[in-house]
Amino acid sequence: MNWITNYVRPKINSILGRREIPENLWIKDPTSGEMIFHKDLEANQFVAPNSGHHMRISAKNRLMHFFDDGVYTALENPKVVTDPLKFRDEKRYIDRLKDYRSKLGVDDNILSARGTIEGLPIIATVQDFAFMGGSLGMASGEAIIKAFDTAIAERRPLVLFSASGGARMQEGTLSLMQMPRTTVAIEMLKEAKLPYIVVLTNPTTGGVTASYAMLGDIHIAEPGAMIGFAGPRVIQQTIRETLPEGFQSSEYLLEHGMIDMVVSRLEMKTTIARLLRLMMKRPAVFNPSDPSPTDSQTSLSTTKAA
C-alpha cells in the first residue's frame, strides 16, 4: 500500500498533469459549517460572508486592509535579550521561539506601523495571536512602548488591536513588568493630548486586559470576541457559582457598559477614522454614498441653528 501511495500515485499524477490541491484552499465557517474559498475569505478580511463570523486574521493582513491602499511603513521593533531565565517546560523556550519565528517569519507577536486611514496619519499596533498566543513578553512590551514613543514624537494618534492570552509565563516577572511599563507609555501619550483607541479582538485576556487593552480613550470590540481576565472555568471554580452564558463576549460587555462599541471588522476603518476626526477636531469627509438627510432632519437642524 505504501508503494502504491508513495510511488505509483505521484507517477500517475505527474503523467496526467494533475496538481495537488492545497490544504487551505477552502476554509470551514465554524458557526454555519459553510465552506468558503480562501481567496474570497481573505478579500473579506476573514469575515464569513453569510454568518458574519470573525475568524482570526494575521497582523500583516489586518494592517493591509486597515491602512489607505494597503500602504504602511512598519516600525522596527527593539532588540531584547532572548530567554533570560533559560526557561524549559516540555520544550526549551529558545527552541519554541525559533520554531514560531521560522514558521511565521516574524520576531515576535507585535507589528506596529505608520500610515493613514482616510487621510489621517496614525500609528497602528497589532498583536498577532498566532505567535505564542499573543502573549506579552519583553519583546512585545518594548515594541508597544516604541509605538507609543513614535506616536508622541510624530504627533499621531495610536490605534491598538489586542489579541492575547496574557503574560508570557516563560519570562516570569520580566513579562509582568511590561504591564506597568506600557501603562506609563499610555499616560505619556495622554499627556501629549493624543487619542488612544483600543480594538479588542478575540481573545483578549489575562495581563493584557489588566493593562493597556483597557486603558484607551475609546474601546471598540469585534463581534463575538472573548474579553476578560481569567477564563470562565477558572472563575466558576473559584467562586463556585454558575455564570451567565456568554458573560465574556463583546456583546455582553457592551450591554453592561464595559466597552463603548461593537463594530464589524469590515466597518472598523471608517468608524475609527470618524472617531479620530471628532477627537482631534478635524473636518468631516463628505461621502457621496451616504444618504442625504430627510426634510424633517434638515428642518430640525435649521430650527436648532436658529
Swiss-Prot record:
PROSITE patterns documented for this protein: COA_CT_NTER (PS50980)
UniProt-recorded Gene Ontology molecular function terms: acetyl-CoA carboxylase activity; ATP binding; carboxyl- or carbamoyltransferase activity
Matching InterPro entries: AcCoA_carboxyl_beta, Acetyl_CoA_COase_Trfase_b_su, ClpP/crotonase-like_dom_sf, COA_CT_N
Alphabetical keyword list: ATP-binding, Cytoplasm, Fatty acid biosynthesis, Fatty acid metabolism, Lipid biosynthesis, Lipid metabolism, Nucleotide-binding, Transferase
Pathways involved: Lipid metabolism; malonyl-CoA biosynthesis; malonyl-CoA from acetyl-CoA: step 1/1
Enzyme Commission numbers on file: 2.1.3.15
Biased composition regions of type Low complexity, renumbered to the chain: 288-306
Main location: cytoplasm
GO BP annotations, alphabetical order: fatty acid biosynthetic process; malonyl-CoA biosynthetic process
Enzyme class: transferase
Superkingdom classification of source: Bacteria
Compartments in which it is found: Cytoplasm
A GO CC term assigned to this protein in UniProt: acetate CoA-transferase complex
Coiled-coil regions listed: none
Region annotation Disordered: where it falls in the sequence: 286-306
Reaction catalysis annotation: N(6)-carboxybiotinyl-L-lysyl-[protein] + acetyl-CoA = N(6)-biotinyl-L-lysyl-[protein] + malonyl-CoA
Tagged with keyword Cytoplasm: yes
SUPFAM superfamilies noted in UniProt: ClpP/crotonase
Protein function: Component of the acetyl coenzyme A carboxylase (ACC) complex. Biotin carboxylase (BC) catalyzes the carboxylation of biotin on its carrier protein (BCCP) and then the CO(2) group is transferred by the transcarboxylase to acetyl-CoA to form malonyl-CoA.
Family indicated by similarity: Belongs to the AccD/PCCB family.
Known partners and oligomeric status: Acetyl-CoA carboxylase is a heterohexamer composed of biotin carboxyl carrier protein (AccB), biotin carboxylase (AccC) and two subunits each of ACCase subunit alpha (AccA) and ACCase subunit beta (AccD).
Full protein name: Acetyl-coenzyme A carboxylase carboxyl transferase subunit beta
